[in-house]
């Protein structure tokens, strides 16, 4: 097994959309190589993780198939240090593949609090662009290299092989130990992560607040990390719920500030519901009753007046305001109650 570390000064996008959700998080950019698509019969052979905060690219390579367990364990130790990872189709492939191989190879239960698997939060750029942008209509397909070309990134990619060719090269490398084959395999994996790091700028081509409301978004407060999977008006309440990913707490309460509320934090799940006022087609949350104070900066929104925040106007959901309020409610809970 080889663990290769390379210094790299690139950053993810600095756009306001990105910083809204990820500014205070330790983010990694991740890609893996395997011998095939089915984790029941194929193996993890290589993983690359760019630790954005440290400015380091990590690659963990199984030099032989029988080193898979050691390589995967080493790579997961790196990824579990992240608050969030960026992938491309990782919710459908990279993350489930590693989870299934881990269960089979390492035969261990995930630590208490690592709800749902080995990676705390996964931003899948493919899902964002596929469902919440116009690129599906503009481009012939949404393969990573196709989107890279659209974003003007073709000149920054050095490798010229496909994922399938990478597997064929690995078979040759395992038999011969060819240095040339190893370099090509590592370059392909390394370039995928470098390009995906640059591709985070594509969030500006999407309806990102709506995407995050649908796909879920991370919330970090102190040593606690959560994923808000659902947020918005539900009946006569404003509802936010999801998973506790790190340092879970157990709590049941029925008041937030001076407002009636239902708050449940149990094992790896959480839920907060507060009153939703309805007036002339508007869905409104009384911020003063919740005693949010300076915890959030919700007063900056045009539809926030005199302590009342509009989260729905007719049939239109205000996704940015909804997500911001959900983040604020979670932070207020940990500040006042936990």
Question: In which residue ranges do the predicted regions lie?
Answer:
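DEDD superfamily 3′-5′ metal-dependent exonuclease/proofreading module
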Residues: 1-42, 51-338
